[in-house]
Amino acid sequence: MDYFPIFCQLQHKACLLVGGGEIAERKARLLLDAGALVTVNACEFTPQFHHWADQGQLSLISGEFVPELLADKWLVIAATDQLSVNALVYQSANQQRIFCNVVDDPKRTSFIMPSIIDRSPIMIAVSSGGKAPVLARLLREKLEALLPQHLGQLAQLAGNLRQRVKQHFAAMTERRRFWEKLLTHDRLAQSLANNDHVQADQHVEQLFSAPLTDRGEVVLVGAGPGDAGLLTLKGLQQIQQADVVVYDRLVSDEVMNLVRRDAERIFVGKQSGHHCVPQEQINQILLQQAQSGKRVVRLKGGDPFIFGRGGEELEELAGYGIPFSVVPGITAASGCSAYSGIPLTHRDHAQSVRLVTGHAKKEGQLDWANLAAEKQTLVFYMGLSQAGEIQQQLIQHGMPATTQVALVENGTSRHQRVVSGELSQLALLSQQVSSPSLIIVGSVVSLREKLNWFSSRHHDDQPKVTECVAHVG
């Protein structure tokens, strides 16, 4: 972060603008809009400056800049076309510890003025830190088109209601739900857009009189395989509205960083072979949180209905009449294979794909003869500890020992590792990776040499992506 983003309260504060041309005019408008007491210093001024001065909106000081003009000033802007003058303004301001902006000169600037989207009291600032001002302008234009003009009226209404809401609703959860209803109320927004404040007030009163349900709910959300960019839009909306987020080990830190900041977070991580929190206890946590009236998100890696025990958790909630819904996620098989350049199906290689759990606790549960059939791709979840058994059973039931395999560790993340080889090497390969890892078996693995797009990109933000290939000696 090259610049610390901050909004300054400049009402009735003395500011100095050095320069009297058209560029200085634009800066003066911003300072006047902010309520600053503006003094402008220049040898010549545009007619607009004289008009402002005649109206008593600012003061003009004609002549060369001298450091004494900085006395009692909160900040200064240099907007002349003379480099020596701008440099003197900056040096003088810096010596007196006054923030100074020199237009189009990042090296002589202690604060920058971003592109602004003004929906007062909502203010949005966009800055590239002086690196790409045109890009900042384009972003501002996109945001201008997205944000309705009545947004400021809605914010002003919310500000006027804050004390009343605080008195009306004792619990913080109730207040937040009221605000969410008010700020997403379509008819209220339309009334404000039409400047129909009578109708808007009626909608507000209806919201105050309507009972806020204290019945909680649970939303089962798939977080995807790791890359936060693979989280669905609906999943993002849910984690940003949650009162409580119950999450496990497979949810990446990048996804957790998107959770609403004041939401309670409950970690129930579990690993193959042992559970940090027993499944029965997880069920009880979800039940108790929902029964207390909270909006609960059960956040699971990948897709919650594919080896995620999501169905078991919802069965428990259904038995108690707790409302629930499901937001599917990109499952690990899809994400890891795509980021490894391995298509799960291909006309020349596989006409079907099977998703298989690799840590079934009872022998004989898997139909190894069918799994060893040709023209299909196998994806084993949680299979590292059983890699030797998988290798032995597939070869024993007729799958060629030379069948291609790949193990994907931390798939789709910047720490992704892919180890590949032949089925006869699977047990050995499994010792080179750690959990979470996915095992892909099938001739489609051979395509990764052509389609391996992710690790072949040498981005600075992906330094950990590595590839390993084992060869039969």
UniProtKB/Swiss-Prot annotation:
Pfam families: CysG_dimeriser (PF10414), NAD_binding_7 (PF13241), Sirohm_synth_M (PF14824), TP_methylase (PF00590). The active site is at D248, K270. Its EC number is 2.1.1.107, 1.3.1.76, 4.99.1.4. It catalyses: uroporphyrinogen III + 2 S-adenosyl-L-methionine = precorrin-2 + 2 S-adenosyl-L-homocysteine + H(+); precorrin-2 + NAD(+) = sirohydrochlorin + NADH + 2 H(+); siroheme + 2 H(+) = sirohydrochlorin + Fe(2+). Keywords: Cobalamin biosynthesis, Lyase, Methyltransferase, Multifunctional enzyme, NAD, Oxidoreductase, Phosphoprotein, Porphyrin biosynthesis, S-adenosyl-L-methionine, Transferase. In the N-terminal section; belongs to the precorrin-2 dehydrogenase / sirohydrochlorin ferrochelatase family. In the C-terminal section; belongs to the precorrin methyltransferase family. Pathway: Cofactor biosynthesis; adenosylcobalamin biosynthesis; precorrin-2 from uroporphyrinogen III: step 1/1; Cofactor biosynthesis; adenosylcobalamin biosynthesis; sirohydrochlorin from precorrin-2: step 1/1; Porphyrin-containing compound metabolism; siroheme biosynthesis; precorrin-2 from uroporphyrinogen III: step 1/1; Porphyrin-containing compound metabolism; siroheme biosynthesis; siroheme from sirohydrochlorin: step 1/1. PROSITE patterns: SUMT_1, SUMT_2. This is Siroheme synthase 2. It comes from Yersinia pseudotuberculosis serotype O:1b (strain IP 31758). One of its GO terms (biological process) is methylation. Residues 1-204 are annotated as: Precorrin-2 dehydrogenase /sirohydrochlorin ferrochelatase. Residues 216-473 are annotated as: Uroporphyrinogen-III C-methyltransferase. Then it catalyzes the NAD-dependent ring dehydrogenation of precorrin-2 to yield sirohydrochlorin. Finally, it catalyzes the ferrochelation of sirohydrochlorin to yield siroheme. S-adenosyl-L-methionine binds at P225, G301, G302, D303, I306, T331, A332, M382, G411. NAD(+) binds at E22, I23, C43, E44.
